[in-house]
Amino acid sequence: MKNNKIKIKSSNLNVHYGEKQALFDVDLDIYDKEVTALIGPSGCGKSTFIRCINRMNDVIDICKVEGSITIDDEEIIDKNLDVVGLREKIGMVFQKPNPFPKSIYDNISYGPTIHGLTENKTDMDEIVENSLKKAALWNEVKDRLNEAGTGLSGGQQQRLCIARAISVNPQVILMDEPCSALDPIATAKIEELIDELKKSYTIVIVTHSMSQAVRVSQRTGFFHLGKIIEVDTTEKIFKNPGNKMTQDYITGRFG
């Protein structure tokens, strides 16, 4: 791979939910302005891992996180860290589209407003337009900005959620199975969008679709039972994996 800049680095990351350990000594490097796909069976720790990156696990009382995650060499597993400031750097797109019960415009303007990015209406209009353009949605909704975001189709709602995520100008976008609730046509649009977004953002995508990982990512990490089994270029993982467990998973022998 040409890109050698590590954006996110996880070292000896362990996560417990009460007595249950969800992640075991996870070491994983995520490179800048690339798509890294995380694959593995359900319940193997993929979503837990990405929720550590934006500290969403903080809201779970029984969750205990140990180890290190750095973004641009800054430690984020730190109780004194400004979590709001961290989340300004990290956009999150969930499994099912979850637009706010607000207008299309307000869905996008909400993040920049709470983060204090601008109080100027003209500047906010520009943020909304640019975010929707980056999410390949502007032409479909530019005359409907005052309509409810929940009135859009499923695929449009997910692109609205992507526009909402990038409206605060993040450095990283986390996607937790963003196409699992979408039809093939809507999925193709999201995948085209991911390919375009990686020019500006570091993207981590959790997916159960092997073919999707091949199509959209430059690197792939395989999780199993809370451990990172193998991580390499996507081409190497799918054409010549170095671990038999990886080979068995991608060929459908277990999962």
Swiss-Prot record:
Q: Which GO terms describe its cellular component?
A: plasma membrane
- GO biological process, any: phosphate ion transmembrane transport
For ATP, which residues are the binding ones? 40-47
Signal peptide interval: none
Q: Name one Pfam family in it.
A: ABC_tran
Q: MF terms per GO, please?
A: ATP binding; ATP hydrolysis activity; ATPase-coupled phosphate ion transmembrane transporter activity
Main location class: membrane
Indicate the enzyme's highest-level EC class.
translocase
What keywords appear on the UniProt entry?
Answer: ATP-binding, Cell inner membrane, Cell membrane, Membrane, Nucleotide-binding, Phosphate transport, Translocase, Transport
Catalysed reactions, as listed in the record = phosphate(out) + ATP + H2O = ADP + 2 phosphate(in) + H(+)
**Compartments reported by the entry:** Cell inner membrane
Every ABC transporter domain range: 8-250
As for membrane topology, the entry says: Peripheral membrane protein
Q: What are its E.C. numbers?
A: 7.3.2.1
Family, according to the entry, reads as follows: Belongs to the ABC transporter superfamily. Phosphate importer (TC 3.A.1.7) family.
Give the function comment from the record. Part of the ABC transporter complex PstSACB involved in phosphate import. Responsible for energy coupling to the transport system.
Task: Name the PANTHER family for this protein.
Answer: ABC TRANSPORTER I FAMILY MEMBER 17 (PTHR43423:SF1)
State how it assembles.
The complex is composed of two ATP-binding proteins (PstB), two transmembrane proteins (PstC and PstA) and a solute-binding protein (PstS).
Check the record and name the NCBIfam families matching this protein: 3a0107s01c2
User: What protein name is recorded for this chain?
Assistant: Phosphate import ATP-binding protein PstB
What species does this protein belong to?
A: Pelagibacter ubique (strain HTCC1062)
What does the organism's lineage look like at the top?
Bacteria, Pseudomonadati, Pseudomonadota, Alphaproteobacteria, Candidatus Pelagibacterales
